[in-house]
């Protein structure tokens, strides 16, 4: 029996196998001593090397590697770069630290080849010891060993992980000089390095100069453009891609979804299906995210169908289940979100966080907090930063100051989660909504991190609710420095001045907006009719085919609401115009147009769901609440802050928003 046919290692260290290998090696040595030809000796040595390589492939721990290394030393193969390279790569594969064992392996080798050096460089890089990896490359060059393409691949990966752009450029230059650039996988690694170093223009230059590309070259750059929000360049590359695989389609679908272009995401998903590519879990999750942004029930139903058709039942796939919970919540159907949550066999922190956030945005604070308490006391799942955002948002949307403080204090004290700017935003929002503006300002001053625009924006929004121009100016000053081009901040300050009757302040802000060349985001509300068609409404929109009927319905509705005591809240109009002009402006707000259209086109018992891109004003909130009473309709209204469920004259927010 030859060495090549010796028994392979079992899953544990097996002395019998080692003993058998020793006997075979001894027999081989005797045979070689009796052999008369160099050819026979060479063949026997090749069999020995082949057997050792095979045994290294089967190693599952360091002890087994050391036993093989012992045989290598005893048989005089300690100078074999081929075997030692394999040994080093096996150490790396098993996660064994390079120091001290790997270094001891290579130090006695007199003539180290580039593959052995590369194995060591790669091992240090994978271990995260990038300085050592670079130092090993320096030693290699001192020995005048010419690097191979694999060497540059390992070094470029290390530069990408370190995000060291300057070092990456140096290796790029050396790669080009030594013609390692000719290999596709080296070019791909270079693209990846530049992408990780946030130098996408350099990545594109590498791509354009590559003599040969594969699908990875294309998809790496497409995904990079998508991550930075440049969907135009991503689409241009995608359309040029000769063969579009699942990775490329996924990059486009998820890219559009993540960059707030849900309609395009759905279009690319449809194209993918028509091309015969089967969606994977990530693509389906991207599709569901796009549906959530559109906020229409017809998309929600199709998302469920696609998930099930693709073999990703929410009950068994936690990623899909969590995405569906988020989607149903954002489409206004929190009950269905709860049903999905209850049906899931496995839940993780993202599942609980999605459900807590869903309940919070729909004004069901006690249910959200109960679920949070259940998760932290009855399961082994630990809350993360998103979970705490959901719990704090529940408190904020319902004015639960004491409970909010308890949740906030428990973050670090109980769970070791350091509060972030987003958590401070929730606390400032909670204190501000309840009129504790000075306390909210003091909290900001004591923050352990620099506040971002969200923190100051929450305070400015609270000043709008409670008509406090003094603190509003403090918040606005910080906002204008942090977010100088966000027009919403200027409009919010203008509204504070308008509510206080300070029209001079309003004019100053408007002048500032004009000087900066900022453009106001136009308000738009939309609903989906019974046929699945989306209808969009803009302020004073007269282009809709039913505009005359909509205006008549609004006038009729105003008359009915007036009987209940409705009077337009003129403070919601931040313009120094007559009261009559303010009334005309208010009646043309987009959500009111959408409501009138829905009353004309829906069945008596059906729920009306309206989506809006901006925050609903105080007058529209009062209007919707009273409309739900006189029409007997359930009206679900989602603005850019939260959901409002209007039923029988009441709102789920308890008029606290």
From Swiss-Prot:
Q: Which GO terms describe its biological process?
A: RNA modification
Q: Which Pfam families match?
A: DYW_deaminase, E_motif, PPR, PPR_2
Output the Gene3D superfamilies linked to this UniProt entry.
Tetratricopeptide repeat domain
Q: Which residues form a coiled coil?
A: none
Q: Which domain of life is it from?
A: Eukaryota
Name the segments for region: Type E motif.
455-530
Protein's UniProt keywords contain RNA-binding = no
Q: According to the UniProt record, where is the region Type E(+) motif?
A: 532-562
Name the NCBIfam families for this protein.
PPR (TIGR00756)
Family annotation (PANTHER family): DYW DOMAIN-CONTAINING PROTEIN, PENTATRICOPEPTIDE REPEAT-CONTAINING PROTEIN
**Family of the protein in this entry:** Belongs to the PPR family. PCMP-H subfamily.
Identification of the protein by name: Pentatricopeptide repeat-containing protein At5g44230
Q: Which species is this UniProt entry from?
A: Arabidopsis thaliana
